[in-house]
Amino acid sequence: PNPDTSTDPAEMLTGGIKTQGKFDFKWGRAEARIKTTQHIGNFPAFWMMPTDNSLGWPNNGEIDIWETIDTEDRAYGTVHTNWTYNLKKGGNSRYMEGLDYDYWHIFAVEWDPTSITWYVDGKKMWSYLKSTKQSELEDGQWPFDAPFYLILNQSVGSGAWAKPADTSFTYET
């Protein structure tokens, strides 16, 4: 909840950290040990955005290492590209169920020139592969040959995916 709406009228304040302008990388492993409070409106994420976003979202890509919403026991891993979002070719997201967010979990991606692979507590969740078809690459199927930076944030829902935030609750990730 926002303790002082006189300086900021938003009902909820959220926050996060990002490495933009301080650290980015092209290929490798990124992981974080995370736990969160499961509650209606919860929408935390650990994700990556391109350092050069000159083509705009989603054309330069986005890698969602981990997201969860509301009271779900799921961990989502997703990519956003022109291919998956604008052209609606699909195949951009998977999830793992059965997570107890009262306990810590390790969420990771391993990213190389031809694939991105998601892990939850060391267990492979899924892989997104670079196409071998030139026409698909030209349509933006794989914008992941450039540096990305990391973001870890605690957001709340607006009703679009996660339900609207409970303004009487303190969300923690």
In which residue ranges do the predicted regions lie?
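GH16 jelly-roll
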Residues: 1-173
